[in-house]
């Protein structure tokens, strides 16, 4: 098979979706109507399960709010792999959550050096619930539609399910999320994320926390290589692909978050440990700095 730009674009775009889905992933937990549990719920919603929104809720708060966020990453790596292009990325997101479990969000991603720079917009709908005696278990079901800036149509939909558990003190937790990504083609991914939670400082209207975390990305992916062949005296690049379902990347994060009233900030260092798959070899570790800012709009009716 001769070189096909769409074949190359397909692989790159799947990596981009894997990156995006991790960067905007979330989990939700307690839904009891008291301050402590509301705080716990919001504590888990956004920024890759690492953002903390504390000490901003009044009594009798109802789960009905809009959350806006803007994330900046100093460099871009797809499944931990260096694409050879140094570029930052920016991810804006607006999400809505209701106490019934319904949630919706719209998001997108901007790359510094891609053309077009605005890669795609995603619209997601979901439903989450907690279960278990202590409400320490949760599940979330969701659907996402992707709208690309170009004519890419390999992966335009995603069906997602996630399961989570954490201890009663909320100092340890883990989630497991699975996605079926499809369009004119299809792929699968599994993402596991585990965290520890340390409160460094806390007052009536301010909180600072450190939560190191580790995530594993397993996905179905076609890896290809190009070889030169001579046909009738002419040179051709011939593509051959190998499909694998394997661990693609391990990421370790060290974020510190600051929250005051309805505002929250997060600053973290992230290390990627990409795992060679198929014919890959000698993959270098990569790292970047992440920064995010968010604001919560309370649209609840107070008693």
Residue ranges and their predicted role:
Residues 1-60, 299-303:
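Cleavable N-terminal export/targeting peptides
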Residues 64, 86-90, 117-123, 155-161, ...:
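Residues that define the transmembrane beta-barrel architecture of outer-membrane proteins
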Residues 70-72, 92-96, 125-129, 143, ...:
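Residues on the lipid-exposed face of transmembrane beta-strands in outer-membrane beta-barrel proteins
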Residues 179-284, 297-300:
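Outer-membrane beta-barrel transmembrane domain signature
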């Amino acid at each position: 098979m001769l070189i096909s730009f769409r074949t190359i674009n397909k692989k790159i775009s799947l990596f981009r979706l894997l990156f995006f889905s991790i960067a905007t992933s979330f989990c939700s937990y307690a839904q009891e109507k008291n301050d402590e549990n509301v705080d716990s719920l919001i504590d888990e919603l956004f920024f890759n399960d690492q953002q903390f929104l504390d000490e901003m809720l009044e009594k009798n708060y109802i789960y009905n709010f809009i959350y806006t966020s803007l994330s900046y990453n100093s460099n871009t790596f797809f499944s931990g792999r260096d694409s050879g292009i140094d570029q930052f990325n920016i991810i804006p997101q607006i999400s809505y959550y209701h106490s019934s479990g319904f949630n919706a969000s719209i998001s997108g991603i901007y790359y510094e050096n891609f053309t077009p720079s605005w890669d795609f917009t995603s619209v997601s709908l979901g439903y989450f619930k907690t279960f278990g005696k202590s409400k320490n278990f949760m599940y979330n079901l969701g659907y996402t539609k992707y709208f690309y800036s170009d004519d890419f149509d390999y992966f335009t939909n995603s069906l997602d399910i996630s399961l989570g558990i954490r201890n009663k003190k909320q100092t340890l937790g883990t989630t497991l999320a699975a996605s079926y990504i499809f369009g004119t083609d299809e792929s699968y991914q599994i993402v596991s994320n585990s965290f520890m939670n340390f409160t460094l400082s806390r007052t009536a209207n301010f909180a600072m926390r450190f939560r190191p975390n580790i995530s594993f990305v397993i996905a179905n992916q076609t890896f290809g290589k190009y070889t030169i062949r001579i046909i009738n005296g002419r040179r051709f690049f011939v593509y051959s692909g190998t499909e694998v379902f394997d661990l693609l990347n391990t990421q370790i994060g060290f974020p510190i978050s600051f929250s005051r009233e309805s505002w929250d900030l997060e600053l973290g260092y992230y290390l990627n440990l990409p795992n060679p798959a198929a014919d890959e070899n000698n993959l270098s570790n990569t790292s970047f700095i992440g920064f995010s800012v968010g604001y919560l709009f309370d649209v609840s009716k107070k008693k």
